[in-house]
């Protein structure tokens, strides 16, 4: 009897050890209470820039020279997009709710760069030196919001005279194209101008047929007053007026009006 009881106890010992091992597992409370990090928490916030009031001093500092050198701020920027063809429009903005998105544009990625109409050296990097045209946003990679600020700042800088731009003056060439090439010559006048005839044939007087005239006379017999012939070749010229006659008419004019 005692042996059978001992055997049953020994058989149940491994099952008890398994239950004990399962109860001894300790789960930390931190893993059960914490939430997964959201996308907004993973984004970095915008730090405060020391050059906010005077942004042009940053472009003269050694930090700027070490980071960019003599190249524009957008020279080494590459857009992150799907496929081999980039979209024709950049993102609307790189900073949402004071959080910077991934791969921000050349201006939003450096918190020490500020778009201001007094920051002339920064504005000159986004204007073509030959034509004076502002570079498009897909060319420089800046977001739509920063591109709008750049356009307004460049226009304001031009109005204040801080950003110099010129319109090239092209001098006309003093060449006579009629003699510059053998195949080019003076255009001959029209044949109608040489003969003295009008340019259009319907402007010339044509005598209507006599049969048509007789028919019209019978039709409008009671309404015709006089018959008009062909128009005169030239209008009659009025004799020139002497200065004395012109002055006398000018003096009598106001009196007759009264």
From Swiss-Prot:
Gene Ontology BP annotations: mitochondrial translation
Alphabetical list of Pfam families matching this protein: Ribosomal_S18 (PF01084)
Residues covered by region (Disordered): 216-258
Residue numbers of Phosphoserine PTMs: 38, 49
Organism annotation: Pan troglodytes
Biased composition (Polar residues): 245-258
Family per similarity comment: Belongs to the bacterial ribosomal protein bS18 family. Mitochondrion-specific ribosomal protein mS40 subfamily.
Biased composition (Pro residues): 229-242
Subunit structure: Component of the mitochondrial ribosome small subunit (28S) which comprises a 12S rRNA and about 30 distinct proteins.
Intracellular or extracellular location(s): Mitochondrion
Record carries keyword Ribosomal protein: yes
Protein name: Small ribosomal subunit protein mS40
CC terms in the record's Gene Ontology section: cell junction; mitochondrial small ribosomal subunit; mitochondrion; nucleoplasm
MF GO annotations: structural constituent of ribosome
UniProt keyword list: Mitochondrion, Phosphoprotein, Ribonucleoprotein, Ribosomal protein, Transit peptide
Ribosomal protein in keyword set: yes
Domain of life: Eukaryota
Transit peptide: 1-35
């Amino acid at each position: 009897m005692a042996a059978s009881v001992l055997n049953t106890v020994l058989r149940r010992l491994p099952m008890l050890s398994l239950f004990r091992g399962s109860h001894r597992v300790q789960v930390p409370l931190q893993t059960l209470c914490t939430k997964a990090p959201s996308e907004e928490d993973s984004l970095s916030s915008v730090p405060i820039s020391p050059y906010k009031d005077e942004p042009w001093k940053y472009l003269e500092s050694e930090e700027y020279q070490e980071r960019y050198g003599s190249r524009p701020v957008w020279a080494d920027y590459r857009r992150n997009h799907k496929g081999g063809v980039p979209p024709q429009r950049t993102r609307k903005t790189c900073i949402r709710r004071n959080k910077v998105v991934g791969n921000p544009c050349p201006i939003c990625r450096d918190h020490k760069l500020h778009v201001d109409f007094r920051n002339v050296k920064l504005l000159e990097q986004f204007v073509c030196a030959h034509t004076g045209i502002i570079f498009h946003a897909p060319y420089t990679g800046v977001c739509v919001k920063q591109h709008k600020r750049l356009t307004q700042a460049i226009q304001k800088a031009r109005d204040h005279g801080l950003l110099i731009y010129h319109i090239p003056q092209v001098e006309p060439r003093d060449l006579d194209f009629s003699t510059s090439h053998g195949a080019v010559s003076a255009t001959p006048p029209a044949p109608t101008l040489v003969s003295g005839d009008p340019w259009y044939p319907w402007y010339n007087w044509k005598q209507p047929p006599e049969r048509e005239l007789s028919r019209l006379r019978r039709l409008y017999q009671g309404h015709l007053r006089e018959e008009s012939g062909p128009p005169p070749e030239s209008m009659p010229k009025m004799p020139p007026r002497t200065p004395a006659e012109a002055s006398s008419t000018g003096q009598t004019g106001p009196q007759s009006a009264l």
